[in-house]
C-alpha cells in the first residue's frame, strides 16, 4: 500500500488551467493563449491583469473602466496604515503583504459574498491596495513618511512614486511593468494549488490569497 503514496504530491494531477501555460522545453509562456513576449511588448500590466481575470484583452472602454475601479480602490484604511506602522521593521515584504491582505478581508464590505461578481470586485481591490501597503511599509522601515497613491499614475508608475516620491525614466517604468507581466501568472504552481485548495473549502478570496502568499515567500530567490 505504501508504494501508492505520492510523496509531496509528485505525479498527482489535481486539475487543469486555462489561464496560462508554461512550456520550458520551448521557452514559452502564454496567458489565455497570448504569448507573454507579445503581451510584454504591446500591453501594459493593467491590460494583462484584465486578460487574466476576464479571459480576453480589454477594448478601450473596458480598460478605462477597469483602470478607474483599480485607481479608486488604492487607498488603505486608517486602521491598516496603523497596523503597518506597528510591524517590525525587519519583517519580510511577503509577510507584510500576507498580513495586509488578511486585514483587507476583515474590512471588505463584501467578505461574505463569494459570488463571481463580488469576487471580481474584491480581486480588483486586492490588486489596487496591495502595492500601496508594500510601498507604505517600504517607506516606514526606512523611517520616512508614507506617500499616498496618485490616481493620475498607472500601477507601475504609482508604485515607484509611493516608494521614492517620484516616477523614474520611462525605460525603468517599462522594465518594471514587464516584470509585473512576467510574474503575473505561472500555470498551476504551488501557490495556485494552495489557493484552489482553500477556495474548495468555500473560504473567501482574501483567505485564499493570504495563504498562497506563504508559498510565494519561499520563491523570492527567483527574482534575484
Task: Label each region the model flagged.
Residues 1-217:
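Hydrophobic alpha-helical bundle cores within soluble ligand-binding/oligomerization subdomains
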Residues 215, 222-224:
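Single conserved hydrophobic/aromatic residue that forms the stacking wall/gate
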